[in-house]
Amino acid sequence: MSAPTSIPALDEASKKELESFLEQEQAKAKLQASIHELTNTCWNTCITGGISSKFSKSEAQCLENCVDRFLDSSLYIVRQIEAQKQQI
């Protein structure tokens, strides 16, 4: 086996660009994970009947409430974390 190819040292501008790109990709991944969690939680909680082309009235209302509560709790958590960061 040959030795791994060394990565040339990056200049500061390239490092910052790479760091910014990685932060954006991590944010996208976190958003996707939140959407997956939201979908899974609300689906399992609200969809009680069989699969059909339309949600029942109660399922639609449950889904709407579930999404609202999920978003409310997510925003609350973010605000609490930001408040804790400011106290440090």
UniProtKB/Swiss-Prot annotation:
Q: What is its main location?
A: mitochondrion
Per the record, membrane topology reads: Peripheral membrane protein
Superkingdom field: Eukaryota
Q: Name one GO biological process term.
A: protein transport
- Localisation per UniProt entry: Mitochondrion inner membrane
Assembly information from the UniProt record = Heterohexamer; composed of 3 copies of TIM8 and 3 copies of TIM13, named soluble 70 kDa complex. Associates with the TIM22 complex, whose core is composed of TIM22 and TIM54. Interacts with the transmembrane regions of multi-pass transmembrane proteins in transit.
What does this protein do, in the record's words?
Answer: Mitochondrial intermembrane chaperone that participates in the import and insertion of some multi-pass transmembrane proteins into the mitochondrial inner membrane. Also required for the transfer of beta-barrel precursors from the TOM complex to the sorting and assembly machinery (SAM complex) of the outer membrane. Acts as a chaperone-like protein that protects the hydrophobic precursors from aggregation and guide them through the mitochondrial intermembrane space.
**What's said on domains?**
The twin CX3C motif contains 4 conserved Cys residues that form 2 disulfide bonds in the mitochondrial intermembrane space. However, during the transit of TIM8 from cytoplasm into mitochondrion, the Cys residues probably coordinate zinc, thereby preventing folding and allowing its transfer across mitochondrial outer membrane.
The name of this protein is Mitochondrial import inner membrane translocase subunit TIM8
State which gene encodes it. Answer: TIM8
